[in-house]
Amino acid sequence: MGENSKNNMQRRDFIKNTLAFGASTLFMSSAFGRTLMNLEGDADLVVRNAKVTTINPKYPTAEAFAIKDGMFYRVGTNSAVSDLIGPNTKVIDAQKHRVIPGLNDSHTHGVREGLHYGLELRWDWVDSVEEALAMLAEEVKHTPKGQWIRVVGGFSWEQFREKRMPTLEEINKVAPDHPVYIFYLYAYGMLNKKAIEVLDYDNAPIDLYHKGRIEKDKHGRATGIITAAPSGLIMYKTLTKLPTKSRDQQVLGTRHFMNEMNVLGLTSISDAGGGGMQYPDAYDVIQDVHGKGLSTVRVGIHTFPQVGGREYDDYKRWIGMIKSGQGDDMYKFIGGGENIAWAAYDYEIFAQERPNLEKNVKEVATPIYKLLAENNWPWRQHITYNESAEILLDIYEEVAAGGGGKLPKGTFIDHGETFSERTLERIAKLEMGIAVQNRIAYQAEDFVERYGPAALAQTPPIKKMLKMGIPVGGGTDATRVSSYNPWYSIHWLATGQSRGGRQMYGDDNILTREEAIRLWTVGSSWFTGDMGRKGAIQEGQLADFTILNQDVMEVPDALIPRTHSKLTAVGGKIVHAYNEFQKFAPPALPDVAPDWSPLYRTGDFRKLYLG
């Protein structure tokens, strides 16, 4: 047996034994009462009459559970928890609703979104250009003169019935007097005439920003299209020119975005930094929200260098400021990424030719990875293409060789759409994980046009990753690429369908619904060092759960994306509830700012589902 095969078997045995131990503790608790945990007093919260999907393979279902001090204490039948109900126990009758562990997005840019939440018009759920333009027209009526109307990612032209984007002519007709910016994936942006005027892009050079273009007509005037070529720098640099919120408004926006995530059943995120997120300044707001005890989503953060050529100095400074794992269960620091060095960044626009990494990538990036490894800082690295992975894995193997054959525990790769089996074997040997997202579901037609349907069928090769024992987490890459709605991603995993309805995968790359939810719970917990601590409804784990509006295990495929939460709890604390569970709801948040926000009209998923 080869070394790779032995490693894979050992990893699978470890995972299997870990799960088996967890399951056995659940059985002991359910059958024999207070065997492993000392419960002084009654349970704080009991949920009963539920259809519980525990994500525990030994005992996958239950009908009740009890919570004490923020942890699951007992899981089993209604009768198994009845003796834990006292005069001060909060009891929730789930009325046969499906209950699952709280969802965990292993790759999102939620901290950044919180700073802007309330300024953006969202097209995530819109299914036609006609409706999108109608929403834009509605915002024109209510947005003060001088303020921007912005649509910043989360949608694809493939989801529209017309199978196209709105045209600049249509946008200019609807919004002649307000500057409008439509941010499409990291491929291109659309600016109406008023926006071009405000930005003065008629007089800006075509190559204003590195590896990006301002499209000009034959007279040298900006057409309204700005293009990643292949870098999206021009797109988010343009965003930074738009008005922002006051700090108090950013705090409130962060709380509202957390509530929006709670409505969708999210209780944890692993944040991937992003453009504009310079550590530590850009994290002041989220730290303030956490410090005041106002967080309703668990957050793990990573540091993302903003300027090429300064990455090593940035990481050296940050290493002197903070350690991996520093923080608590609600907010903690994880490591570096998703960008470590700009020379190692390969972007993700499948309508364009595959970009090459910079020629000096090994010279630039190797010292940075070694610095991180020497200081036990795990990292996450954006890698889209197999060709990029082959180069970077050479560096990782060199770094691992200097560290006893290992990288810092918890090091992983983001994306991996076109990874080969050989690349997966190398990742498995290094004991790295892979965080996957439904980015490809937003670009399926572009991918097929360039690479063909056969290549699409294993983009990314999720089942191969799992068979090799590689830790895999579910995610979105929200909010400027995909929607932050986890159920679009779960639908993609469980059906193999794109946002436009293309059947991308066969059975060899499609998961069951429970497997998809496992990636979004237990799977994602690995990426913040929380494996065994959260992700399952199981004794001794953090009591994060959601009561769903529909039985996601039974509804037709087409209805999976309509799933949301009727009640969400984080650490046993109820952070969202409505309809029949309204009496358990926490106090409403102050109104979102600004007072002309699109959230008051076209709204978000809260407004879509809750009214």
PLM feature segments, named:
Residues W377-E387, M465-S489:
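Short acidic/histidine-rich active-site segments
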Residues M1-I85, D127-P144, L191, V251-V263, ...:
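Active-site microenvironment of metallo-dependent hydrolases
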Residues K193, Y279-Y283, S388-E397, A444-R450, ...:
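Histidine/acidic-residue-rich catalytic or RNA/ligand-binding cores of hydrolases
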Residues D42-R48, T53, P57-I319, I334-S388, ...:
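Divalent metal-binding segments
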Residues M330-A341, M432-I440:
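Non-cysteine beta-strand/loop elements that form the S-adenosyl-L-methionine
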Residues T108, M432-M465, P486-S498:
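Flexible glycine/proline-rich, aromatic-decorated loop/lid segments
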Residues M321-D328, I427-K429:
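Acidic (Asp/Glu)-rich catalytic clusters
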Residues A428-A435, G469-P471:
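Glycine-enriched alpha-helix->loop->beta-strand junction motifs that scaffold or abut catalytic
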